[in-house]
Amino acid sequence: MTQAEHRPTNFIRQIIDEDLASGKHSSVATRFPPEPNGYLHIGHAKSICLNFGIARDYQGTCNLRFDDTNPVKEDVEYVESIQRDVQWLGFEWNGAVRYSSDYFDQLHAYAIELINKGLAYVEELTAEQIREYRGTLTQAGKNSPFRDRSVEENLALFEKMKDGGFKEGEACLRAKIDMASSFMVMRDPVIYRIKFAEHHQTGNKWCIYPMYDFTHCISDALEGITHSICTLEFQDNRRLYDWVLDNISIPCHPRQYEFSRLNLEYAIMSKRKLNQLVTEGVVEGWDDPRMPTVSGLRRRGYTPEAVREFCNRIGVTKQDNTVEMSALESCIREDLNERAPRAMAVLDPLRVVLENYPEDLVEELNIPNHPNIPEAGERLVPFSREIYIDRADFREEANKQYKRLVMGKEVRLRHAYIIKAERVEKDAEGNITTLYCSCDRDTLGTNPADGRKVKGVIHWVSAPHALDAEVRLYDRLFSVANPGAAEDFLSTINPQSLRIVPHAKLEPSLRDAKPEFAYQFEREGYFCADSKLSSAEKPVFNLTVALRDTWVG
């Protein structure tokens, strides 16, 4: 995966190929239009890779446009985080960042054009009445009593809306289409509503705000977008997208294409539910390493290359499906296996004394940073009379399948000597506090001269040089594959999604670990220093992914 990423093929790219071949378009222009009301998640990453990837591969452009038509739910914090995420994923947008609010004046003018054409009217039914009049999937809606107002009256009332003459909910502007349409979205949809809220871009200039379906298509047209790509839930909305553009004086008419959204096992993609996890303190924030957000994945140690590869592998189709979490984990595992430098860390330390090793001797062992990349260089790792091994790597008694250290038996220390367990020291409760071993000083980097075979290999850290650290072992946030289907999704939280190891012992080279840069802790997994919690005084490392998939559900 460190090699050049392959160029994917999918039905949208086939459409683009046909459009270019036929001369329908001479170039390609796409856009990524998030609403700044939350942090981006892995589902958005799929859309980013699709839209920006198309622009890159066809030498076209991709705009970053914030769909900022609801000032109540939006925040500059989200605007900034989204820009960081897009850039982290390896993409750059065309020109300046754009906002739907950049077009509020034009959108207002197009709304007036629809009124003048008798295609929009000011509605004074309540929201509940509008829902009642809309009908159902099997029953046609009925016309509003305000539907046949004159153009002059509608213009005056819309101006009154704009000037703050109505309270929120007292009036809205609706498109006049067909209350008997078999598509609910075409039953006179609301295209403007009143909101007395300060906007993060326009301040208090407006108290009326356009709806998404009205804004989106016009913004696409104003920007000259050729292929407007969105997820399948907007498939019916394409009819409204086309209706708006067909009925206003705008030369460009983009086309909308839909693909299936990403559904990932053991995760949720609803921004509302993700926000609930944050506001109710279930997680530590939008960038909690258990969250499926781009910032959460980054903090956990995921690489942009792994995320892009995942998006390439799952592909772009029109069929809804759910992707196994192991598919995402496989991508980061493969990527880090190739690139991550190795280090040794003992998560559950057991003190070991090598009784025949000189007390005042410290050896600096040259250990390769990566077994398959010589150019990654070497590091010096201290070795001394007292070391730590993992408690799970020693047993007083064990069967033949146990290949680690057993009382009276030998094991090799990774990159170092063969040692033999001689005796233990225990506390009053019978817990082993110290393991005493002998060390074969003739086996550093070589096999025993007498030809005896020692199969087991374990990792270690020099005790006087060890870096004390907190290690956070992350697992899947939910205990069921489809938490979104549960009546109460919070009841499916995995209580073991975070386990904190407070006193891990790490080799000293990790003292300078950069946040979010992953290492392979040999025999343990891939870990990175936490970007928020880790410090020189108290290092904190996050588990990115285990060496192999051990999830049993």
UniProtKB/Swiss-Prot annotation:
EC number: 6.1.1.18
Chemical reaction(s) catalysed: tRNA(Gln) + L-glutamine + ATP = L-glutaminyl-tRNA(Gln) + AMP + diphosphate
Keyword Membrane attached: no
Gene Ontology CC annotation, any one: cytosol
Top class in the EC scheme: ligase
Native source organism of the sequence: Tolumonas auensis (strain DSM 9187 / NBRC 110442 / TA 4)
Location(s) in or outside the cell: Cytoplasm
NCBIfam families assigned to the protein according to its UniProt record, in alphabetical order: glnS (TIGR00440), PRK14703.1 (NF011291)
UniProt-annotated binding residues for ATP: 35-37, 41-47, 231, 261-262, 269-271
GO molecular function, one term: ATP binding
'HIGH' region, short sequence motif: residues: 34-44
A Gene Ontology BP annotation from the UniProt entry: glutaminyl-tRNA aminoacylation
Quaternary structure and interacting proteins, as annotated: Monomer.
UniProt-recorded name of the protein: Glutamine--tRNA ligase
InterPro entries from the UniProt entry: aa-tRNA-synth_I_CS, Gln-tRNA-synth, Gln/Glu-tRNA_Ligase, Gln_tRNA_ligase_bac, Glu/Gln-tRNA-synth, Glu/Gln-tRNA-synth_Ib_cat-dom, Glu/Gln-tRNA-synth_Ib_codon-bd, Glu_tRNA_lig_a-bdl
UniProt KW ATP-binding keyword: yes
A Pfam cross-reference name: tRNA-synt_1c_C
GN (gene name): glnS
Keywords per UniProt: Aminoacyl-tRNA synthetase, ATP-binding, Cytoplasm, Ligase, Nucleotide-binding, Protein biosynthesis
Short motif 'KMSKS' region, span: 268-272
Domain of life where this protein originates: Bacteria
UniProt similarity note: Belongs to the class-I aminoacyl-tRNA synthetase family.
